[in-house]
Amino acid sequence: IPGSLVGSEMCIRDSNKDKDGLSFDVVCPSMPGYGFSDKPSQKGYDSKKIAEINHELMTALGYKKYLVQGGDWGSTVSKWSAELFPNEVLGLHLNLVIAFPPEKDDPMEGVTDQEKVLLGRYAKYLELGSGYFEIQRTKPQTLGYSLNDSPVGLAGWIIEKFHSWTDDEKDKLIVSLEDVLSIVSLYWFSESITSSMRLYNENGREGFSKSKVEVPTGCALFKNEIMLPPKAWAEEIYN
């Protein structure tokens, strides 16, 4: 939440403006339980499982080599793709970089003063803004009954995240209202808000492998990002 394929479509829309003669295919799989993708009928569909499904899809489509890109839970799925299929994944690109303190005597070694400020901002988010995560992780079905029964409730639950997590200016959404409503509508008409939240439960607190990937990695970093881990931490996990 609040991501969806609508965001991917927005990126594709912009990338087509000036390709400088480049030709490439873009495959945007909708994760199980999101949008109009089938809802899992059994447990076990965590980020690792989704990465395996995505690889099966790319193989079936005839791609022997490919790049992966992800943000939010897609970041963990993409990380798993690079870890599980290093011979097929040529590169990993993330717009949410997840990294945690390394397990060594001084985990703050190499962390700059500016990065410490960013860690403080993340700590504030954990204190004041992460309640949604715990609810969706522990009680996705209970919350889903309410959100799936009220379009206003669903819109409020999703749009609040856009206000809190984006670079909005003077309480004005930086994302167009039309695009935001498209995202809300996708969840509403597909009745997928409940099944999408189950991924939080499947992944537990992290849904993330801390093993280092050797696949070349690039990151998009934005000044108001919630999680901006120190470079020294990221280098312990990414190449």
Residue ranges and their predicted role:
Residues 1-12:
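Single conserved hydrophobic/aromatic residue that forms the stacking wall/gate
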Residues 15-23, 63-112:
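Conserved hydrolase catalytic core segment
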Residues 22, 31-45, 79:
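Glycine-rich "HGGG/HGxG" loop immediately N-terminal to the catalytic nucleophile
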Residues 28, 68, 219-221:
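Structural beta-sheet core signal
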Residues 48-66:
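Conserved acidic catalytic loop of the alpha/beta-hydrolase fold
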Residues 107-140, 209-212:
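The feature captures the conserved acid-bearing segment of alpha/beta-hydrolase catalytic domains
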Residues 136-239:
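C-terminal subdomain of alpha/beta-hydrolase-fold enzymes, centered on the catalytic histidine
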